[in-house]
Swiss-Prot record:
Keywords: Cell membrane, Disease variant, Ion transport, Membrane, Transmembrane, Transmembrane helix, Transport. The gene is Lhfpl5. The chain crosses the membrane at residues 25-45, 99-119, 129-149, 179-199. This is LHFPL tetraspan subfamily member 5 protein. Forms the MET channel composed of TMC (TMC1 or TMC2), TMIE, TOMT, CIB (CIB2 or CIB3), LHPL5 and PCDH15. Interaction with PCDH15 is required for efficient localization to hair bundles. Auxiliary subunit of the mechanotransducer (MET) non-specific cation channel complex located at the tips of the shorter stereocilia of cochlear hair cells and that mediates sensory transduction in the auditory system. The MET complex is composed of two dimeric pore-forming ion-conducting transmembrane TMC (TMC1 or TMC2) subunits, and aided by several auxiliary proteins including LHFPL5, TMIE, CIB2/3 and TOMT, and the tip-link PCDH15. Functionally couples PCDH15 to the transduction channel. InterPro entries: LHFPL. Belongs to the LHFP family. It is linked to Defects in Lhfpl5 are the cause of the hurry-scurry (hscy) phenotype which is characterized by rapid circling behavior, frequent shaking of head from side to side, deafness and vestibular dysfunction.
Length: 219
């Protein structure tokens, strides 16, 4: 006959395994958050949101704030734009998209900075703060991706992609990897946010009520 463990001893074993698993998931979440921040910074900086194809009148590509368009007289690309040079950004929609993606980037970086709070604050509270920041970052990325195509009717984009180009119509151009990555990043941010919320609420209640009750009865 199998001998059952006392309630308190079983609770201690459960508690140890529970904490170990929570820490493992927390380390995984933290690592993924750091990797995700690098990804968001890359898609913010890189000017490869849309670009030319074999059918476009000239070569080039556009990002959130910078772009390069081929010279009609030569094969060289003329590049313009910068995050602080708002006058060179082709359209208001691009400026708006840049703002929201930048906001998402800073929120993700902010959630990484919040890791230092684990040493001085309640663990559950820190997880929840990071979760809300990552949820807000997902919202910023979503708004940026939705607004960005509204600027495709700008003269600079039409010059490269053809006269058929308009709002949410890319003409002869194609979507590049940075834009696709930004769309996928929305889901990544939502998953990280969900994990942080789960970790936060798990920290609020490390032991189930039935184990606590059994322990009290044993005493």
């Amino acid at each position: 006959m199998v001998k059952l463990l006392p309630a308190q001893e079983a609770a201690k074993i459960y508690h140890t395994n529970y904490v170990r698993n929570s820490r493992a998931v927390g380390v995984m979440w933290g690592t993924l958050t750091i990797c995700f921040s690098v990804l968001v910074m890359a898609l913010f900086i890189q000017p490869y949101w849309i670009g030319d194809s074999v059918s476009t009148p000239q070569a080039g590509y556009f990002g959130l704030f910078s772009y390069c368009v081929g010279n009609v007289l030569s094969s060289e690309l003329i590049c313009k734009g910068g995050p602080l040079d708002f006058s060179s950004i082709p359209s208001r929609a691009f400026k708006t998209a840049m703002f929201f993606v930048a906001l998402a980037m800073f929120l993700i970086i902010g959630s990484i900075i919040c890791f230092s709070l684990f040493f001085v604050c309640n663990t559950a509270t820190v997880y929840k703060i990071c979760a809300w920041m990552q949820l807000a970052a997902a919202t910023g990325l979503m708004i940026g991706c939705l607004v960005y195509p509204d600027g495709w009717d700008s003269s600079e984009v039409r010059r490269m992609c053809g006269e058929q180009t308009g709002k949410y119509t890319l003409g002869h151009c194609t979507i590049r990897w940075a834009f696709m990555l930004a769309i996928l990043s929305i889901g990544d941010a939502l998953i990280l946010s969900f994990l942080a919320f789960v970790l936060g609420y798990r920290q609020d209640k490390l032991l189930p009520d039935d184990y606590k009750a059994d322990g009290n009865e044993e005493v």
